């Protein structure tokens, strides 16, 4: 007899750039399972399509569950949107090329989708600098204008059919011209604004082995983006959140950090553009 989970396929959407990115991915943990597949979006970054194709075949030629798309575009959000438009999985998860996946946690999340047809998105626990964030109990996630709800993409498993009309903002994230983070926060906030059913599960699907946004928080491009996100999520109370955030960031001093965050929060045209998306 077939189980409900037999109808749930999971596709991991991997954004990377150049041949070096494929090599990083090959060193990561990519579990094998009959219901699991991987779609790799490799932005050329100056490398030829032929060299990328040859390296992919060398590294993953024996993996029929891993497929490749080569893009001439640039920017993490742009790559994710392209992958989202091409995924075939019932459930999709976005990851970077240096993320290690946990097979047991992926199976648990898949089974949860199978037995909870009303759930659109599962948010899982994340680890930042060795510290777990998210809590130890399952819960329904709702938007809270004071506290906010934030997420990272590799801790979100999402039903493909629930995400119509949603996309990552190309002006945010690695490779963007000005705002070098914030793409996950805005995307997830818009998931909640759309009224999708989001459940939190205290499992860890993925571990990010590379440099995280938290580790480059002092970068002006990241702080600008944090200000933009704070003004979007907390339009009336963002100065309080900005002051608290500035105190936690090491490197440039509280006042300089606060000024940079406030500049991002004051970009009313960009914030209005996000609200129109």
Which ranges hold each PLM region?
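N-proximal low-complexity "stem/linker" segments adjacent to membrane-targeting elements
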Residues: 1-37
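Conserved donor NDP-sugar-binding/catalytic core segment of glycosyltransferases
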Residues: 104-136
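Glycine-rich, basic loop-to-helix element that forms the pyrophosphate-binding segment
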Residues: 70-87
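Catalytic beta-strand/loop signature of glycosyltransferases that borders the donor
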Residues: 195-207, 219
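Short beta-strand-to-loop acidic/aromatic patch adjacent to the donor-nucleotide binding site
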Residues: 90-100
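Acidic donor-binding segment of Leloir-type glycosyltransferases
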Residues: 26-70
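Non-catalytic, C-terminal membrane-associated alpha-helical segments of glycosyltransferases
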Residues: 218-277
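Acidic donor-binding loop at a coil-to-helix junction in glycosyltransferase catalytic cores
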Residues: 173-187
């Amino acid at each position: 007899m077939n189980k409900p989970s037999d109808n749930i396929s999971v596709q991991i959407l991997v954004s990377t750039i150049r041949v070096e990115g494929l090599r990083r991915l090959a060193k990561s943990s990519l579990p094998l399972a009959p219901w699991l597949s991987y779609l790799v979006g490799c932005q050329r970054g100056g490398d030829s399509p032929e060299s990328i194709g040859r390296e992919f075949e060398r590294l993953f030629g024996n993996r029929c569950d891993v497929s490749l798309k080569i893009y001439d575009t640039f920017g993490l959000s742009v790559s994710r949107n392209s992958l989202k438009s091409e995924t075939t999985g019932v459930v999709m998860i976005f990851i970077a090329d240096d993320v290690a996946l946990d097979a047991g946690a992926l199976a648990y999340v898949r089974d949860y989708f199978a037995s909870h047809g009303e759930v659109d998105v599962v948010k899982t626990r994340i680890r930042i600098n060795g510290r777990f964030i998210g809590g130890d109990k399952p819960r329904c996630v709702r938007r809270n204008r004071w506290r906010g709800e934030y997420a990272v993409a590799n801790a979100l498993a999402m039903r493909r059919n629930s995400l119509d009309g949603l996309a990552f903002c190309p002006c945010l994230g690695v490779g963007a011209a000005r705002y070098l983070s914030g793409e996950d926060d805005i995307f997830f906030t818009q998931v909640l604004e759309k009224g999708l059913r989001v459940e939190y599960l205290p499992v860890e699907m993925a571990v990010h082995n590379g440099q995280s946004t938290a580790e480059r928080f002092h970068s002006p491009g990241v702080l600008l983006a944090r200000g933009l996100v704070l003004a979007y999520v907390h339009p009336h109370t963002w100065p309080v959140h900005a002051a608290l955030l500035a105190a936690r960031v090491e490197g440039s001093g509280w006042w300089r950090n606060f000024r940079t965050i406030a500049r991002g929060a004051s970009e009313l045209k960009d914030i209005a553009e996000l609200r129109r998306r």
